[in-house]
Amino acid sequence: GYKTQTVEVGGRTSFNIVLVEEATAVDEVVVVGYGQVKKSDLTGSVASVKAEKLTDIPANSIDGLLQGRVAGVQVVNSSQDPGASSTVRIRGNSSLNGSNAPLVVIDGFPWGDAGDLKQINPQDIVSMEVLKDASASAIYGSRGANGVILITTRKAQENVTRITLRQQTTISGFSSELNLWRDPVLMAMLSNESSINAGLTPIYIGATNANGVYYPSIAELQTTWTTNTRWDDLVFRPTPVSNNTTVQVQSSNDRTMFQASANYYLDNGMYIEDTYRKYGGNFSVEHKLLDNLRMKASANIPSIKRHNNGGLAYWRNPIFPVYDDNGDYWLYGAQDYSHPLALTDLQKNDSKGLDIISFASVNWDVLPCLNVMAQFNYKHGEQITDKYFPKKYSETGVFNDGYGSIDNWKDDNIVFEAYATFDRTFAEKHRLTVMGGYSYENYQSRSSSLAAKGFINESLGNENLAAGDSETYSIGNGSYKTELVSALTRINYTFDNRFLFTFTARADGSSKFGSNNKWAFFPSGAFSWKMHEERFIRNLNVFDVLKIRASYGISGNQGISAYQTLSRYGQHKYFNGGKWVTAIGPGYQSGYTGQDGIYALWSGIPNKGLKWETTAQVDLGLDMSFFGNRLNVTFDWYDKRTSDLLRERNIAPSSGYDKMWVNDGEIRNRGIELTIDGVAFQNRDWRVGGTFVFSRNRNK
């Protein structure tokens, strides 16, 4: 945008006016739940990350784009495995056993929790909004209890045809040389000294141990011993390379906008043969049926292939060779639990996944002040995991004479939503926006697993589970279904563009709870005062924006598995004492006590009194802008309390049960958030600026 300028006419008839760009678009449109508002009209705590900032640093995942960008949002990389998901939290953990992940909404579609972000190509993203306080997220009810991340993807521009190729290559490496043993002599000396100090017999004495493995003496290591294997050089990639390639086609005319893209992402892990591949296709079309009637449809289809290699180079003793005299992998005794190259070649740990996410909507401007929106979303996911661990080698130290398994699951999620929005200004100073809607969600999941041990022939691995010992066969399957029905409303009132009020309410009914607690009501309210619109503030000539905010709201959490309020009855068959034993009882068998696994514990005990977790949150905020919006400051203080925590409680074994779900306990999160964003210099070609983000959360 450009700055507003005032020029005195006087007696002049011609003027030279130079457009000056605004450093920050204060009145840019920000996406909120079930609608859009101007940034200056926000009453809740909403952080926006636009396209120009998303391209500042390369990232192969959306959680990588969020990391360090938004105050109060914590992104933790818990694993360095290729394709691994990060843990995303907004203002701390609010639940012990329920979900703590924020809801992700893409182009209006409730996608899932933040663990699904890896399915989305970050190069398709235009902007992200993070709803942090209850007044902003309560409109999503139980699904928004942990905050909401709203993502807007790329769309075609009007009357433009464009083909875009984006290529991103990332080269990784260890920041320093791994701290592994390089000197076998020093290693042996320290090992012997440690054993002696502990009252044990040292092993580096030139003798063969109980496993038949010869450990040389220190004198041998100093003179005649020649084996000093650099396991890290054999197992680790020196410079893992990742590539993310996207081809996008956009086209439009006066009535239709079309966009399609194809993506290939390859992430090579630190270990050899450790890879993650993602193939993705995405398209969207928006068509104006009439001047006041629009339809939109889109689909996103990511396919994932994962080949997992655990490595274990840091476990391996450098005095051990890679191969024996016959050219086979060297064995530590009869069985070996840490030979990294043998595990790389002989074990199997692969997974394949496919997701189909589709979206369709109709948008009707019934009147200039009344809009009706209906949308249908369907998401299908499936995955199969193949594993085989050979007889002689294991990365866990547990040997089953060969172990193979096949696990698969699939789920289907259907969401239908319809809402109407009334927006009108009365007597120039009074603006009223009212939204009311309905939401229905149906989720179904099904899984199955096959496993066997004791393989006679390993040539086909888990492709021939019948080669395993029939007495070790394990077969399991399960399915469940949940439904969520909701009614929602939001009322925004603005007086004289200075005082803004927001009220939201949502009623959720979940099939996970019993009849007495099935429904929950989640209200919120917020107030904002644009002090910079007051004359006494304008006369100071200091603030471009000075706004205070206050909000309070309640949200809920239904993050438990299905059927915990219902009595369940199941059968479990297991091999014990040389024979098959069938256990029949309430639910499923979850554990044993006593010798030989004779005593079964069950987890089918219902709790019909289970109810929603509820989170109440208060937020106080301050927004300021200076120097023609070149310096922007946002500060928030919040206090968030979650009560009636959903958690599993242990039960006395004498009852025959293991655990049951209860409402018990409270969690409190308090904190402050500060964001300072500044632009030192900006013209048509250059922009020099920076962002400072600080947040502090205390959890109790």
Question: What are these model-predicted stretches?
Answer:
Residues N326-Y329, E428-K429:
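Detector for glycine-centered tight turns/loop "hinges" at secondary-structure junctions
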Residues V104, V322-Y323, Y493:
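Short aromatic-centered micro-motifs
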Residues A84, R277, K391-G397:
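Short, conserved phosphate-binding/catalytic loop or strand-edge motifs used
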Residues I203, A219-L221, T396, D469-S470, ...:
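Extracytoplasmic gating/loop element in the C-terminal half of outer-membrane beta-barrel translocons
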Residues L54, A59, N100-A101, S284-L293, ...:
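Extracellular/periplasmic, surface-exposed regions of secreted and cell-surface proteins
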Residues E8-V9, G115, L312, A334, ...:
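Short clusters of small/polar residues that mark proteolytic maturation junctions
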Residues R306-I319:
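Low-complexity intrinsically disordered tracts that form flexible linkers/tails across taxa
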